[in-house]
Amino acid sequence: MPCLALLTTGGTIAGTGAMNRYTAAQLGGQDLLAAVPGLGALADLRIAEVFALDSRDLTPAHWLQLAARIRALINDPSVDGIVITHGTDTLEETAFALHLLLPAHKPVVLTAAMRPSTALSADGPLNLLQAAKVALSPESIGRGV
């Protein structure tokens, strides 16, 4: 079975509360996985909670820390793909920084959510499942972040 690394950084995907009044970065990786029952059947999972922040609070120093963690996973022959949960405010900046900082030979996929995990019709679980499928797809190898 393939191995998928899940790195959590916080954001709305890990937020709790109502849609219009929530607190970002409240849930850890196990909580996020519990909302995606089929994910464990796709891969062996490794979870690392890197940050628990609202993404607007991430800085270039955080990007460097995250890149170092990902680089170690890229160099681990047992890891097939990497998914990072993130907030929407700075997801594209983080993705671009990681794309520039990391080698592209293993899939690295960022995902986020527009609605917190406890909101009606939360979008995070499906986003996480789809990100995992992309990260585990052989077609994603060599395409960067």
Q: Residue locations for each model-derived region?
A:
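Active-site histidine-anchored catalytic micro-motif
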Residues: M1-V145
